[in-house]
Amino acid sequence: PFESETATVPNPILHFTCLDAAIAIKPVFERFSSVIITSGTISPLEMYPKMLGFTTVVQESYTMTLARKSFLPMIVTRGSDQGAISSGFQIRNDPAVVRNYGNLLTEFCKLTPDGVVVFFPSYLYMESIISMWQGMGILDTVWKYKLILVETPDSQETSLALETYRTACNNGRGAVLLCVARGKVSEGIDFDHHYGRTVINIGVPFQYTESRILKARLEFLRETYRIRENDFLSFDAMRHAAQCLGRVLRGKDDYGIMVLADRRFLKKRNQLPKWMQQYLPESDTNLSVDQATAIAKKFLREMSVAFPKGMQDGI
């Protein structure tokens, strides 16, 4: 009944929420005899028939045909000091972890031309990390290489930040956009070509598990569809992570670096879309910041060579 923990006057809030996604898609299945659900980032596939209440005729995840390897996915699990990096609850505010994330950002801002997009699991976590980076002098270092812009819950402010970001990328100053994995930026804004040469996922974008709405949904999924809480949370987080990474690759002649910065991604990489797994060798799944930087530099050197017209035919 209280809005916050410190409030003394009861102020009840009534939430209406749809726990069953099958309700929304049911009219589509009733009206059409054949329905195709397709996307580059709807993996792992097994969860959708369960949650939406349908049986599949064909369920397939495909790899991607590329004339050259135009994106570089990698999992960074350690900082330069070999300490583990993660947004896990126990160590998320550990100064050593925050500094390692800061070093990762600095190194990638140094080597990446034009635009860098960084996704955090939540606004709260992003704000606490930014203030700690400010105290450590990390933002001052990043500022030398890129303009720093931050997404906020206010959509007008965010639109203005995006406009400034694009201008900075166009005029050669370069920019880094700090945003949230479930915010406006991650959902429908493309960072094609020079607007997104590197995307960094800082931490696994799990939902806030203390939310009453989420708890109700998890209980519903467990009782109705026999979907375990952890399975759903993991599926949901990896789907959002893949969606964030997919923002940088928007065409056959586009290229970009995709960084998953959390040791927990190591065990979850088989939940990424097949086309990402296809270009993620074992050697790139347990990297330190220094190793990741070296691999990224090599990749960008290869990408700087002009793409011959003949290689583009038939793709």
Give the location of each predicted region:
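ASCE RecA-like P-loop NTPase motor cores
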Residues: 1-315
